[in-house]
């Protein structure tokens, strides 16, 4: 890829943030990182990433609060958000989808596999719709 594609990783775990940043770079993404929900929302407004990978469980402002804030803001409402979670309960996932999550990825995950998933999903979102 000739140009880095901006994505945002919001996770309170520094090891996960840095690992995702390195993994995503292998697939042509430039990952901006935020260590908490508030800084993540602000960074999303500033950088306009093409994707957001959002941890569900964080202190102060959890992933669902961040998701709600992003989806109720004209500047960020159209950015696809993938929840990173170890919560596999159907009710939890339904709530995330109701708020506006586009997909979810369960922890633990393989970093290389995650990079491939994000690249594939990004290509799907950016492909022009077939007409007729």
What are these regions (language model features)?
Residues 14-32, 121:
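Two-component/phosphorelay signaling modules centered on CheY-like receiver
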Residues 47-53:
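Active-site beta3 strand of CheY-like receiver
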Residues 58:
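Receiver (REC) domain active-site loop signature in two-component systems and cognate sites
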Residues 109-118:
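C-terminal output helix
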């Amino acid at each position: 890829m000739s140009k880095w594609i901006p994505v945002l990783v919001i996770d309170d775990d520094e090891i996960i943030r840095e690992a995702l940043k390195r993994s995503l770079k292998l697939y042509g993404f430039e990952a901006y990182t935020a260590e908490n929900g508030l800084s993540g929302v602000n960074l999303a407004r500033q950088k306009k990433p093409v994707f957001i990978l959002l941890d569900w469980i964080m202190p102060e402002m959890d992933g669902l609060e961040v998701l709600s804030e992003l989806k109720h803001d004209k500047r960020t409402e159209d950015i696809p958000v993938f929840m990173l979670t170890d919560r596999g309960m159907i009710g939890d996932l339904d709530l995330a989808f109701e708020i506006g999550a586009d997909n979810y990825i369960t922890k633990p995950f393989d970093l290389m596999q995650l990079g491939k998933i994000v690249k594939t999903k990004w290509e799907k979102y950016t492909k022009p719709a077939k007409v007729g």
